[in-house]
Regions:
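Beta-strand C-termini and the immediately following turn/loop, strongest in propeller blades
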Residues: 217-223, 243, 256, 261-267, ...
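Extracellular glycan-recognition regions
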Residues: 19-218
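Structural motif
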Residues: 226-228, 269-270, 313-320, 360-365, ...
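Conserved beta-propeller blade repeats
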Residues: 246-262, 288-303, 335-353, 381-401, ...
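Mid-chain, structured segments of secreted extracytoplasmic proteins
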Residues: 76-90, 96-97, 262-298
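Short loop/turn segments that connect beta-strands within the blades of beta-propeller domains
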Residues: 155, 225, 257, 265-266, ...
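Multi-bladed beta-propeller domains
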Residues: 228-248, 273-289, 322-337, 367-385, ...
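Bacterial Sec-dependent N-terminal signal peptides
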Residues: 1-20
Length: 507
């Protein structure tokens, strides 16, 4: 009898372990509501994607049946991912998406961002345990269809749903107050076949769970915020997290060999393989107060850095140049503040933004890496701002962001500062245009419209976008929580197919 009891306990333990096996970033993985056909969730570390298979009659009325990959989480958070059904499917109302749930009980309160097989996209909820969900009282419908990216955000008791067609900004689907949802909840991915006799499958990628901080957040007072170092193919939008830390690092450059990235952290510069692994410090001699404005010359031999100094010539950020293999940097700009942003293709000159003569306005300057008399390329008025200046690979243009029109937009001008031409015309605050090595594309970051026009703060809901170098309609290539330090400097891969950037995972 003891042997039978022990065997039963082992079998039960194995079943529970199978349901809660860690799957990628998720600790929970289970069928909810005991569907007749068991589901599964798998994670592919090669591309950091998920595959969910599941059955179930529905997620509706007073009880649910579906497959769920989830974490226990509390407080405010943002859930974002790309979704695609596999195969034609049996029922047009097969569904996948994000779900926030009070418990694993089949009749638990929940609120879900749902994408159906026929394209119907809705936010649905059950307010109370065992409550019967009703149409249309317990759902909000998206106006469009064909969405691929789904986001669900909780801020206090309010839950917001957003959705986007690939390449387009998020649309606000709606919000709902879950007054009876506990602070500690389950949050994760789900799939339901809407037919208890079949199994459906979904592919899910770019899965991110972020913990946003408040607008009054202060890092020195409130502690470190997590960072991810990511790479992304700009043409299919697929992202890879290669390094994570509960602390701040910023602004990756892609090394000329295509095999490593360079980024700043705690005043120093570090290298890491593009596939992840151990970080190694790059020697910058006595210059050890480096910020997020650094980049590599076109010939791959030199590195420009911006670092704080305090001497008779100036106090604040100055531009230096050092060999890419490391060494003691050479000062380029004795006057401060000066922030590097671009190399000339001749590898002998740099451009940077700086304030001069005590006037609180940044302008774009050019100078030889040997120092000497700098040349002002812009002369803007107080209240305006310019930043993010880079040469095109042929040296013909300088691209930059500027608030000449009253909103921060992308511009280009001739290399001598003449012929200013506006490139973006939308409501977003567009910063840091980075030109691909082949000269064909601009990758840049877009802040929300409500951000102050000359500001690029940290910890915001931002987009990375791509557009032709000659102008045209921008395409969204990434939705993330980030901002300052995400992509301040050139980060293209040598083959012009990928970029690197930093996103914030939150506290």
């Amino acid at each position: 009898m003891k042997t039978i009891s022990l065997l039963f306990c082992l079998l039960l333990s194995g079943t529970l372990m199978a349901q809660t096996t860690v799957t990628g970033i998720f600790q929970g993985n289970a069928d909810i509501g005991n569907p007749a056909i068991k589901g599964s969730a798998s994670y592919n570390p090669a591309d950091q994607s998920y595959s969910l298979k599941g059955s179930g009659y529905n997620i509706w009325f007073e009880r649910d049946e579906f497959r769920y990959a989830f974490n226990q989480i509390e407080g405010d958070f943002i859930l974002t991912a790309n979704f695609r059904f596999e195969g034609q499917g049996t029922d047009p109302h097969r569904k996948t998406g994000w779900m926030i749930r009070a418990s694993e009980d089949e009749d638990s309160p929940h609120i879900s961002a749902v994408m159906h097989g026929d394209g119907l996209t809705v936010m649905q909820w059950r307010d109370f345990k065992g409550a019967e969900m009703k149409d249309p009282e317990d759902e909000l419908f998206a106006k469009g269809s064909g969405y691929e990216i789904i986001q669900l955000e909780r801020a206090g008791k309010i839950v917001f749903m957003r959705a986007a067609v690939a390449g387009k900004p998020f649309e606000n689907i709606g919000s709902y107050a879950m007054e009876n949802m506990p602070d500690k909840v389950l949050a994760g991915l789900f799939i339901c076949s809407h037919n208890p006799e079949v199994t459906e499958q979904a592919a899910i990628w770019n899965v991110r769970i972020d913990k946003p901080v408040g607008d009054n957040y202060n890092a020195s007072r409130d502690g470190a915020v997590g960072c991810r170092l990511e790479t992304m193919n700009v043409f299919d939008g697929k992202r890879m997290v290669i390094h994570e830390k509960q602390g701040r690092f910023e602004a990756p450059n892609w090394m000329p060999d295509g095999k490593q990235l360079l980024f700043n952290m705690d005043g120093l510069l570090y290298k890491i393989p593009v596939t992840g692994g151990s970080v190694t410090q790059l020697n910058t001699g006595t210059v050890i107060r480096n910020n997020n404005d650094h980049g590599i010359s076109f010939n791959g031999k030199l590195l420009a850095i911006s670092s704080s100094k305090d001497d008779a010539a100036g106090r604040g950020s100055a531009v230096y140049v050092v060999k890419l293999k490391g060494g003691e940097p050479r000062l380029v700009t004795p006057e401060t503040p000066s922030y590097w942003h671009g190399w000339h293709p001749n590898n002998k000159e740099v451009i940077y933004v700086a304030q001069r003569k005590g006037i609180p306005v940044y302008n774009i300057y050019r100078n030889s890496i040997k120092g000497g008399k700098e040349v002002a390329l812009t002369d803007i008025s107080e209240g305006e701002h310019v930043d993010g200046c880079e040469y095109s690979p042929d040296g013909k243009y300088i691209y930059y962001n500027g608030s000449h029109t009253g909103n921060m937009q992308l511009w280009r001008m001739n290399a001598d500062g003449t012929g200013r031409e506006q490139l973006t015309f939308d409501e977003y605050k567009n910063w840091f245009p980075h030109i691909s090595p082949d000269g064909k594309w601009i990758a840049f970051i877009s802040f929300p419209p409500d951000i102050e026009k000359n500001s690029h703060p940290s910890y915001k809901r931002v987009m990375l976008r791509l557009m032709p170098a000659g102008g045209g309609e921008p395409k969204v290539i990434a939705y993330l929580y980030g901002g300052q330090g995400t992509i301040n400097v050139p980060s293209w891969s040598p083959d012009s197919k990928q970029i690197a950037f930093v996103s914030n995972s939150g506290k």
